[in-house]
């Protein structure tokens, strides 16, 4: 039984979606004013991995992830670049889709945009005003935070603590408009030159928090099975979403809240962020690092834990992924000389590997324990293919199991599986030299033939074995 750590209750809970076999999941997407950095991508990859495991477990996942395409940051960035806010949004939405595709992130079922839902946002706000949860003030509309009985529950903060924090961050202009420092904006009156829409309260634009309430409930209903995002969104964004949504619908907004840990960088383990200027964009990094390696690096740390970003971590991820790909390739190669037949022992072993993988992942998507099982499967596969005589059916079964389990982490072992790089060639040459030293000429010939089939010609010389790539 899958258990998920619910931020709202601060404990692991058995996962029971509202509708058997179907999961409605909403993940807060990016504000599209720049390229996403590794910290942003952590959330994307973490919850894509959660989605993949849910699908592996047999669920149909309705996955909605939004684009915030209008807010203060968007307006500022558009002005700096000398383009309109819609032009800025288009530019970085395209970049986001390209970068996440490179990381093998499955497209969301729906990618709604705030600017495409203005009518729904206005209607939502009107309903909150009618119910007494919101009020107009000087062209702005604010939510009455204290009126919502459970305000602060998600983040575990008292109203007194929240009031102190809010008072420190409220501008003089806002103090004049708000009835309470805790109140937050649902609609903002337009300033000269800003993008705007007509509304019952005058020209303006939506606040950030209301956008997600409107888009999530529009596509997934009043109650979501899972709502996810970074830990930094817990307050105020997700706290405010709950207040808005439950005040309007009268129903519980979310059954399971999931929040991912940060990516840290440097000796002091600082959180990676644009505001600190210590970020590395995915757009730039994938020009230097294999996107599959970056994906594997991020998807093999449990989503609630922080990730320390470093070159050493990427090198380690690359080595581990290379071992998995080599194993997959070796299985494919041994199919050529495999005999027909089955092996009940192998099937039982594979069933055990799968059961242990599921047990690990069912524990709040514990990918670290899950990948440990995959590495055990890899060692088992390598031991099997090193036998002199192998059977076709067990090899196919091992290969399929390895591919399916690794796919949960967003990596396709079949991609470029037939390609061979210099590192792998040298590894096989060393293995062949060891076989020759032990007078295992059958294995030596097998490795030579394997390389030749992939266009690599070996030449044994007094100075050692050299290789060249066969010309077409």
Swiss-Prot record:
Record: residues binding ATP: 274
Biological processes annotated in GO: cysteinyl-tRNA aminoacylation
Cofactor: binding comment: Binds 1 zinc ion per subunit.
InterPro entries: Cys-tRNA-ligase (IPR015803), Cys-tRNA-synt_Ia_DALR (IPR015273), Cys-tRNA/MSH_ligase (IPR024909), CysS_C (IPR056411), Rossmann-like_a/b/a_fold (IPR014729), tRNA-synt_1_cat_dom (IPR032678), tRNAsynth_Ia_anticodon-bd (IPR009080)
Example of a GO MF term: cysteine-tRNA ligase activity
UniProt-listed Gene3D superfamilies: Cysteine-tRNA ligase, C-terminal anti-codon recognition domain, HUPs
Cellular component GO terms, alphabetical: cytosol
Any Pfam family: CysS_C
Protein localization: Cytoplasm
Chain positions of motif 'KMSKS' region: 271-275
Catalytic activity annotation: tRNA(Cys) + L-cysteine + ATP = L-cysteinyl-tRNA(Cys) + AMP + diphosphate
The entry's keywords: Aminoacyl-tRNA synthetase, ATP-binding, Cytoplasm, Ligase, Metal-binding, Nucleotide-binding, Protein biosynthesis, Zinc
Motif segment ('HIGH' region): 30-40
Binding site for Zn(2+): 28, 212, 237, 241
EC category name: ligase
SMART domains the record matches: DALR_2
Catalytic activity, EC: 6.1.1.16
Required cofactor names: Zn(2+)
Quaternary structure annotation from Swiss-Prot or TrEMBL: Monomer.
Entry similarity comment: Belongs to the class-I aminoacyl-tRNA synthetase family.
Protein name as annotated: Cysteine--tRNA ligase
Organism of this sequence: Limosilactobacillus fermentum (strain NBRC 3956 / LMG 18251) (Lactobacillus fermentum)
Gene that specifies this protein: cysS
